Design a protein with these regions (language model features):
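Aromatic (phenylalanine/tyrosine) cluster motif
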Residues: 6, 16-18
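Histidine-rich, glycine-flanked metal-binding segment
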Residues: 27-83
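Di-metal (Zn2+ and/or Mg2+/Mn2+) metal-binding site signature of metallo-dependent hydrolases
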Residues: 80-102
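Active-site gating loops and adjacent loop-to-helix segments of metal-dependent hydrolytic enzymes
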Residues: 89, 112-123, 164-192, 234
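Divalent metal-dependent hydrolysis catalytic cores, especially in the metallo-beta-lactamase
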Residues: 92, 108-137, 151-164, 191-203, ...
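Metal-dependent catalytic neighborhoods of phosphoester/phosphodiester hydrolases
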Residues: 99, 132-142, 169
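Histidine/acidic residue-rich metal-binding segments in metalloenzymes
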Residues: 177-235
């Protein structure tokens, strides 16, 4: 399992998180001292099919055998489960902040909160919004660099505006529009390539053309749609 190393302070997230045995209210391994971590000790480590008492040894940016572990501090996980770091693939915000606010400080607060809940990687979602607001969001995402004790931003989910006006859910139907290769390309450039998922309603006019052209450039998610089986299969 890979390990995340923070180049700015040389602390390490082992790719594991701590959780108290009463629930996921403990701290993430990223919430540790800002030093090189050598080992997570004393916890019940999640394995192939069960938890077992054990240690997690670290060498730089990878999980290692004990004899190959690097020099550094040991984290005491006594009384905790030690699990693989969780990945949050779809959330809009937390702690009063939202990705669509396009706030650098807000995105850092979101990443810090997620890390404290055992989530070591995040892929937050934007809303259906006008072009200028989406550009601001993408610029904020493109410039983001996680700090110590924050979850890593591994990408983002563009949930709209290329959806069905009849299946908007909590989205604003005023800003729903046909999928645009030109617009998406501009947004992706602003996000520095961090848009990893884009929601598309394939039955809407022109959207199948978008899917055909862009499916090898970004992962397409069929969502907020009224498509029948045949249309979805074609997409």
């Amino acid at each position: 399992m890979s390990v995340r190393t923070y180049a700015d302070c040389q602390s390490v997230c082992t790719g594991y998180s701590f959780a108290t045995k009463g629930g996921m209210q403990g701290m993430s391994a990223m919430d540790s001292a800002l030093e090189q971590v050598r080992c997570v000790t004393g916890g019940d480590v999640f394995g192939a099919d069960c938890f077992a008492a054990g240690n997690v040894w670290i060498n730089g940016s990878t999980i290692a055998d004990e004899g190959c572990a690097c020099e550094g501090v040991e984290l005491d996980a006594s009384g905790c489960y030690v699990i693989p770091g969780l990945i949050d693939l779809h959330f809009h915000g937390c702690m009063g902040d939202d990705l669509s606010d396009a706030s650098a400080e807000g995105l850092h607060r979101m990443a810090a909160y997620e890390a404290k809940r055992g989530i070591t990687a995040i892929c937050p979602a934007s809303m259906t919004l006008p072009h200028d607001r989406l550009m601001a969001i993408m610029g904020n995402v493109g410039a983001f660099e996680a700090e110590a004790a924050e979850a890593e931003l591994v990408g983002m989910n563009m949930e709209g505006p290329y959806i069905s006006p009849d299946k908007v859910g909590a989205q604003n139907p005023e800003y729903v529009r046909a999928a645009s290769i030109e617009e998406f390309t501009e947004l992706q450039q602003a996000a520095c390539g961090r848009i990893k998922l884009v929601d598309v309603a394939p039955e809407e006019p022109g959207n199948l053309d978008f899917i055909r052209e862009m499916h090898d450039k970004v992962r397409i998610s069929l969502a907020h749609m009224c498509a029948d089986y045949d249309t979805a299969k074609t997409a």
